[in-house]
Amino acid sequence: VERRWTAVEGSSMYLRVGESYTLRELLEGLLLASGNDAALAIAGSLGGSEFIERMNRKAEELGLTASHFENPHGLDAEGHRASAHDLALIMAAALQNSVLAEILSMRSSCIHGVTYVNHNKLLWNCPGVNGGKTGYTKAAGRCLVTSCERGGVQLICVTLSDPNDWKDHAALYDWAFETYAEFSLPE
């Protein structure tokens, strides 16, 4: 871990300069603890200055049309933006990756003797929630992307700048699963 990766504002997994972490450990610190330092360490290790270009290329491949990335952690920056629709597409893609799906569903993880608890409290409070990512910046406010599966149906919910995100996600899932009806179209 390089010192420059640890000098970032906001949430952190408190990486130790000079210590080694696996990519899996950094992903857990990023996704459970919202570790901005982990995001910088991943970007620095996997591509340096080219990492953001790779992120934006991947965004195009995923069909994201209203998002552009300027940094790996999502903190406010000129030109950095993401729409609710695009965040849902990112979550859907992440859930297709077994490692990311597993990490997103973890309630906690112990890395180098430090326990990280997932910021997504819906994992404890909302039946069927099996993943998600919290976010907050002064410009964006509270943002939340979650996934929930009940009865073999998987849904993704995204709220942006929502001070009641936990209640809103739980209520939206309850409403959607209560009103969802499966039917066959006539041929």
Model-derived features: positions:
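Domain-terminus/edge residues, biased toward the C-terminal soluble/receptor-binding domains
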Residues: L64-T65, D76-E187
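Active-site-adjacent loops and short helices of periplasmic peptidoglycan-processing enzymes
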Residues: V1-H85, A94-L95
